[in-house]
A protein has these predicted regions:
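P-loop NTPase motor domains
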Residues: 26-37, 42-46, 51-233, 237
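A short beta-strand-to-loop transition that corresponds to the Sensor-1 phosphate-sensing loop
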Residues: 238-242
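C-terminal regions of RecA-like/P-loop NTPase motor modules
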Residues: 245-246
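Short linear segments in intrinsically disordered or otherwise low-structure-confidence regions
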Residues: 17-18
Length: 246
């Protein structure tokens, strides 16, 4: 859950609601609604969409936004493609190349309709000569044209509310970790927007340890949490024993 705050009642209520329990993000939904917040339900059958390719051009003081987005896409592809050994060097190179190509139109004319979606990356991978590119594209296919294509759309959700709850409990086993990673990237975009408005952002995440099991994804998660803190984000996980065991 994402909450920009300025010391108002919701901060106390959220802390009291969490108490000593392990809070599932969905458990916050009734509270968020009572506080006139926004609950965003993401599932294979929902009509709420988050585009994992969304790029905020003002997301870093010291690093290219495109480089940071490439790190995120590499982490996403590791969950989809990597297996036990993670992405291989050639696979990483191909993905990074295609990420930089897929944003050309948007960087030249940064309007919402030029923002790429996952299918644009998939099509670029198909155009590459290396057999590794075809392997990656085939692994992505189910998330683009198959039954798990919930993240192959332009974003259509409103995250301007002071309190936002992402409910991903219905994503299922195949999509849960991907959903967590995509939400984390969306929260990072919001942290940067709030920072520009001189606001802090409190972020509660359940089962964060699931993002620490793959090397690339763990590295990205650790790096993004450092950035959260630097940019005025206040991230909070659940049971510390799960994090230490991950």
């Amino acid at each position: 859950m994402l909450e920009p705050y300025d010391g108002k009642l919701s901060r106390t209520v959220l802390r009291r609601e969490g108490g000593g329990n392990t809070a599932d993000p969905a458990d916050y939904a009734p509270l968020v609604e009572r506080l006139h917040g926004q609950v965003i339900k993401i599932s294979p059958t929902s009509t709420n969409y988050i585009n994992p390719m969304d790029l905020n051009l003002d997301c870093s003081d010291d690093e290219s936004p495109l480089s940071l987005k490439s790190d995120f896409i590499l982490s996403l592809c590791e969950l989809i493609v990597g297996g036990k050994e993670g992405l291989q060097p050639v696979q990483k190179t191909i993905i990074d190349r295609c990420v930089r190509l897929v944003y050309n139109e948007y960087l030249n004319d940064p309007k919402p309709e030029n923002m790429p979606i996952l299918e644009d990356l998939y099509n670029l991978l198909r155009e590459q000569e290396e057999k590794e590119a075809q392997y990656i594209a085939t692994a992505l296919e189910i998330y683009v044209t198959g039954s798990l294509n919930v993240f192959n759309h332009q974003s259509n959700v409103d995250i301007d509310n002071r309190i936002v709850c992402y409910d991903i409990k219905e994503l299922g086993k195949q999509l849960k970790k991907i959903g967590m990673l995509v939400v984390q990237d969306q929260v990072w975009n919001r942290v940067t927007i709030n920072r520009a408005a001189h606001k802090s952002t409190r972020y509660y995440i359940d089962e964060m340890h699931l993002l620490l099991k793959e090397e690339q994804t763990a590295a990205y998660t650790v790096e993004i949490w450092k950035r959260f803190r630097k940019w005025g984000g206040i991230p909070t996980g659940d049971w510390i024993c799960n994090l230490l065991a991950a």
